[in-house]
Amino acid sequence: MLRRGLLSFFMVILIDRGTSQLYSSDMCNWKGSGLTHEGHTKDVEQVYLRCSEGSVEWLYPTGAMVINLRPNTLTSAYKHLTVCIKPFKDSKGANIYSEKTGELKLVVPDGENNPHKVYCFGLDRGGLYIEATPQQDISRKITGFQYELISQRTLSDLHTVSDPCRPCSDTEVLLAVCISDFVVKGTISAVTNDEELQESLINVTVDKLYRQKSKIFLPKDNGGWEGMIRTPLECGVKTGMGSFLFTGRMHFGEPRLGCTPRYKDFKRIYLEAKKQGLNPCEISTD
């Protein structure tokens, strides 16, 4: 490798060849063209990104590249991160693999086109290896995706991504209330199931808005708030069923359902923890 330390925050070098390339890159996003790679199809490009979220866009892919993802704070904690990628609509022209010490595992095959599907794996597998597939005509071929790094030590993050239908433990509920992107008390007024995307879109009528980082829930004319949350279809969410405490995270710009206990159960859990001095944060239960 050529001076990896000097160039680690940007798209950097070719392995085996030192020809200069024209790319746009910052710490979070990378965009480049395979047209500058023609004639060097056996070269493997190295890209270094230092961000918790961003995007990669490879126009006219030829040859291969390795995407090295790390958080913007380099500590040993990066080994406990989950990488999630969401391919762009109509992304094509290359296979995407996870890579660990030379071993490749196919994550997204070329041509698999589901604009809402998200692929996740542990960062301890290493980087992403993207290999262009043989093409007679590379024009109009673009391989691209968004990525997010999610802490496996943050229980609400891990629950939302890896096992969204599993009921949360008391500890997970208490932590979710403190660190989720949205926390509301409300009821399920409608559920729309999308068989193609294998998702349910939950319409929530909100009685009490504790927190939201994005404008998920908007005021209603007759008081309260209303908004939509996504969850996998397999979770079997139904309308009615009483009052809940809804928590969750923004995931690729969409609100995803996290821990959602019945409100009466949350109130019991919270008050018991508070009595013992074990509640990680304060929240009104009136």
Curated annotation (Swiss-Prot):
Keyword Secreted: yes
Disulfide pairings: 28-51, 84-120, 165-235, 168-259, 178-281
Any one GO molecular-function label of the UniProt entry: hormone activity
Gene Ontology annotations of biological process type: brown fat cell differentiation; energy homeostasis; negative regulation of inflammatory response; positive regulation of brown fat cell differentiation; response to cold; response to muscle activity
Glycosylated residues, chain numbering: 203
GO cellular component: extracellular space
Family: Belongs to the meteorin family.
Name under which the protein is recorded: Meteorin-like protein
Provenance organism: Xenopus laevis (African clawed frog)
Gene name of the record: metrnl
